[in-house]
């Protein structure tokens, strides 16, 4: 049965589920939703996700939203991949870092994404707000220190094996340069992201995200 992914490819939340599918070799059909045109705010899309957010997975009659849940569902199709961990403690550690991303890392990165990318390019609503940037910078450094420390002595977030935690947290780093993340002091984060970016699945997903919508669909 075909796995359909409703995504807006520039979003890190879309990227992470697309990258997991690519890494696992799961064939998917991408359904591109244009956020600036309001395509998530239609009755048809609300029937898929009442929150009117992407990404959404649809497989037959089964519909799942929230990127973390989608990633776990995809990884569950290929448990031998190790993306979910091999033991209960490993799975809990991976889940902990996925939740850390939702609670801390993603909101910190989102400040920069909104101020430097969404406002000027999508909303066309003016210059970045210095107060918002100052608050975002404080948040970013608080949590970048945590992540940098966690990566010290580890190839990936939870150890020597690639897991869903890496896809969850690493996706935002794709926009670090245009969104001006203050990541320069964090050598472990930069080293780790370089490892992720070199993955074939990561490269394939970056290429998909660069496609025109019609071609990607």
Where do the protein language model's features map onto the residues?
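GST-like domain detector, emphasizing the conserved glutathione-binding G-site
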Residues: 1-131
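Active-site-flanking alpha-helical
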Residues: 20, 75, 172-173, 206
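Conserved beta-strand edge residues that scaffold enzyme active sites
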Residues: 35-36, 165, 210-211
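Phosphate-coordinating loops and pocket residues in cytosolic domains that bind phosphorylated ligands
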Residues: 47, 85, 169, 198, ...
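GST-like fold's C-terminal all-alpha helical module
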Residues: 98-198, 217
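Terminal-tail/helix-coil boundary detector
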Residues: 202-217
């Amino acid at each position: 049965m075909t796995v359909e992914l409703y995504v807006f490819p520039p979003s890190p939340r879309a990227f992470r589920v697309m990258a997991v599918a690519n890494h696992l070799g799961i064939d998917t059909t991408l359904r591109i939703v244009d956020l600036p045109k309001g395509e998530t705010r239609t009755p048809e899309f609300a029937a898929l996700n009442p929150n009117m957010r992407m990404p959404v997975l649809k497989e037959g009659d089964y519909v799942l939203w929230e990127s973390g849940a989608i990633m776990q569902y995809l990884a569950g199709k290929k448990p031998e991949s190790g993306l979910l961990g091999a033991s209960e403690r490993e799975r809990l550690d991976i889940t902990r870092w996925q939740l850390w991303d939702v609670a801390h890392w993603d909101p910190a990165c989102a400040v920069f994404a909104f101020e430097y990318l969404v406002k000027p390019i999508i909303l066309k609503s003016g210059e970045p707000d210095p107060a918002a940037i100052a608050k975002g910078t404080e948040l970013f450094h608080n949590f970048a220190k945590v992540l940098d420390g966690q990566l010290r002595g580890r190839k990936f977030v939870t150890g020597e094996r690639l897991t869903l935690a890496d896809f969850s947290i690493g996706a935002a780093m794709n926009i670090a340069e245009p969104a001006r993340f203050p990541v320069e002091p964090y050598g472990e984060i930069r080293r780790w992201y370089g490892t992720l970016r070199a993955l074939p699945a990561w490269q394939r997903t970056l290429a998909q995200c660069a496609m025109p919508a019609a071609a990607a669909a």
